[in-house]
């Protein structure tokens, strides 16, 4: 699992502001990573570092889309959110149907 062994999150003014601009608080975003998330590589945006896309639910049950990378400092690994936004209902419906198909196998 990509997030296995992660120590915590790496925040600064830039990524905090970018997420909050889309209405996603630090607490909401972090809570989503404490639940089950679908995580995919994002090769289209991985020029300088490997990036990932995560889709999941916050502790309030809202569906969230997160772009992030992993940063390594002094032997520890941190999730560095790049951007996050709440998903539109059409996206939520598509995601839930896709998950249901996987579960039916």
Q: What do the predicted segments below correspond to?
A:
Residues 1-105:
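Ribonuclease/tRNase effector modules and their secretory precursors
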């Amino acid at each position: 699992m990509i997030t296995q062994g992660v120590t915590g999150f790496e925040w600064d003014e830039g990524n905090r502001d970018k997420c909050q601009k889309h209405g996603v608080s630090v607490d909401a975003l972090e809570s989503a990573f404490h639940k089950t998330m679908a995580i995919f590589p994002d090769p289209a945006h991985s020029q300088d570092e490997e990036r990932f896309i995560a889709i999941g639910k916050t502790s309030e049950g809202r569906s969230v889309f997160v772009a992030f990378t992993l940063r390594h400092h002094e032997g520890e690994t941190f999730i560095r959110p790049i951007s996050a936004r709440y998903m539109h209902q059409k996206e939520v419906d598509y995601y839930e149907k896709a998950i249901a198909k996987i579960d039916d196998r």
